[in-house]
Design a protein with these regions (language model features):
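Cell wall/extracellular polymer interaction/catalysis modules
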Residues: 10-46, 53, 74-76
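Beta-strand residues in well-ordered beta-sheet regions across diverse protein folds
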Residues: 27-29, 57, 87
């Protein structure tokens, strides 16, 4: 008599995060099926978001930029060794415009959903694809209003509650 046991393993699906700099959108597919379509902000002039294919290198629920005045980067998914990440922002009016310092910004709520998805499916099953020309190089703005960038980074007084903004209550 041969006994076999099976354990209920967690099935993982391939997650593809595609960022199109020309239209400032992120499309997320899971197992080849579209899951999310969100507005983003990529690098402003002089702060390019590098094109190419990547895998997440590390994830940090609460991160503050050492390079840009301790700017909050909630739900950060780092995809280059130079510190480029997908992360949340509370500058919601700037989504759809190329205004970041090279990271891919999206709303905190969407960043939290993406972070949870990548954590559940695994960084090894996740691909980050950055494509398209920058808005300024594409000769258009993708139908979005271009906003001026500032060197200040984040207006800390306008953030949501610290627990909500940085995911500490989760």
């Amino acid at each position: 008599m041969i006994l076999t046991t099976t354990t209920a393993g967690s099935a993982t699906a391939e997650v593809t995060i595609t960022v199109d700099k020309a239209v400032q959108r992120m499309i997320v597919t899971v197992g080849g099926q579209p899951r999310y379509d969100w507005p983003v902000s990529t690098g402003a002039d002089g702060y390019d978001t590098p094109g190419g294919s990547y895998r997440p290198q590390r994830m940090e629920r609460t991160h503050f930029s050492r390079e840009f005045d301790d700017a909050p980067m909630p739900f950060a998914i780092f995809f280059t060794g130079q510190g480029h990440a997908i992360h949340g922002t509370n500058h919601l009016r700037q989504l759809g415009s190329a205004v970041s310092h090279g990271c891919v910004r999206l709303s905190v709520r969407n960043a939290a959903a993406l972070f949870a998805l990548v954590k559940a499916e695994g960084t090894g099953n996740t691909h980050v694809q950055i494509e398209g020309d920058d808005l300024s190089m594409a000769g258009g703005n993708g139908g979005y209003q271009q906003t001026a960038r500032t060197r200040r980074g984040y207006d800390v007084d306008s953030v949501m509650s610290a627990g909500d903004q940085m995911g500490r209550g989760m």
